[in-house]
Regions:
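Amphipathic alpha-helical binding modules
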Residues: 62-86
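Amphipathic alpha-helical scaffolding segments comprising HEAT/armadillo-like alpha-solenoid repeats
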Residues: 6, 21-26, 50-60, 84-86
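A general marker of short, structured functional hotspots
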Residues: 4, 23, 31, 52, ...
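Acidic, low-complexity, intrinsically disordered interaction modules
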Residues: 31-67, 71
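Short terminal alpha-helical segments
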Residues: 1-32
């Protein structure tokens, strides 16, 4: 894994561990050159509810995060009737 990718994954994981939609939006804004413009606009312009769902889905898919933390997001999504990646 390249240094750049390692740094990105580390920053992403730190953002996900904060569990904040404001942090998610800031992260996407700061890294907008790495994402398709449609994804950037979707995250920056969506409702807080959609951003929160997206955050939890990202947490479930981030295998570097602690298992229990990921499972908390699985439970959060399941309780609300949403799918997950774990």
């Amino acid at each position: 894994m390249s240094k750049e990718l390692k740094a990105f994954v580390k920053a992403r994981d730190e953002m996900l561990l904060k569990g904040s939609i404001d942090e998610l939006r800031s992260f996407v804004e700061e890294n907008r050159g790495l994402y398709d413009d449609n994804i950037v606009h979707d995250i920056l312009d969506c409702s807080d509810k959609v951003a929160e769902i997206t955050l939890h889905k990202m947490i479930t898919a981030a295998t570097n995060l602690p298992f229990e933390y990921r499972m908390n997001s699985v439970a959060w999504l399941t309780e609300r009737g949403y799918g997950h990646y774990a």
